[in-house]
A protein has these predicted regions:
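Extended, charged/glycine-rich binding lobes that contact polyanionic ligands
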Residues: 1-46, 50-56, 64-190
Length: 190
């Protein structure tokens, strides 16, 4: 598979689960603060929105919002598919008030936050992960969390979870494209 380990420890498996999507929450950071605290300006070229999505892949969400707002959607990063995510998106309104200020449906929620002049300062993402496990693992999990916290940060892992697929074959499709084997690439996608 496409698993990745960033901490070299001889840890044995722990029987824990993450209830998806609610147990995996991602907040985009803007100027080192959660995007839920972001407020735009009274004027600007772009209308900024808070986008909340639940259990929907990024590109499906963007496509739906583009259809709704009838404008190209800009964003700073792709958020996880099987999660609850919060991020800022923005559309060019040439400074005009947007027709839609709030909207909710199909696992998506939009809220107009004001205007921005251009790209905002995306400083990272914050993850809230809720594990379900039996009490026997509490002390061990605390030790492991402390060990990971000592690292200060974890590198970004961009894999199949971003694209909402249960079949992690994007690396194989990429190889087929590089080799110019178009039919094989399509076969792996299908």
């Amino acid at each position: 598979g496409m698993e990745r380990y960033y901490v070299e420890e001889p840890w044995s498996p722990i029987n824990a689960t993450i209830k998806r999507p609610e147990g995996f929450v991602v907040y985009e950071e803007v100027d080192w603060k959660p995007c839920t605290e972001f407020r735009g300006e009274p004027v600007g070229r772009y209308a900024a929105y808070l986008l909340e999505k639940r259990g929907i892949d990024h590109f499906t969400a963007v496509s739906k919002v583009q259809s709704l707002l009838r404008r190209k959607v800009n964003y700073a990063g792709i958020k996880d598919a099987n999660a609850v995510t919060y991020q800022i998106i923005y559309v060019d309104t040439s400074g005009k008030e947007p027709e839609i200020k709030e909207w909710e449906g199909n696992g998506l929620r939009l809220k107009f936050l004001g205007f921005i002049k251009g790209k905002y300062n995306h400083t990272g993402n914050v993850f809230e992960i809720t594990l379900d496990f039996s009490d026997e693992y509490t002390d061990e999990l605390r030790r492991r969390i402390a060990r990971v916290a000592d690292l200060g940060r974890l590198p970004a892992f961009i894999g199949y979870q971003r694209f909402g697929t249960r079949r992690p074959t994007t690396h194989v499709v990429g190889k087929m494209l590089v080799l110019r084997e178009w039919c094989n690439a399509v076969d792996f996608i299908l």
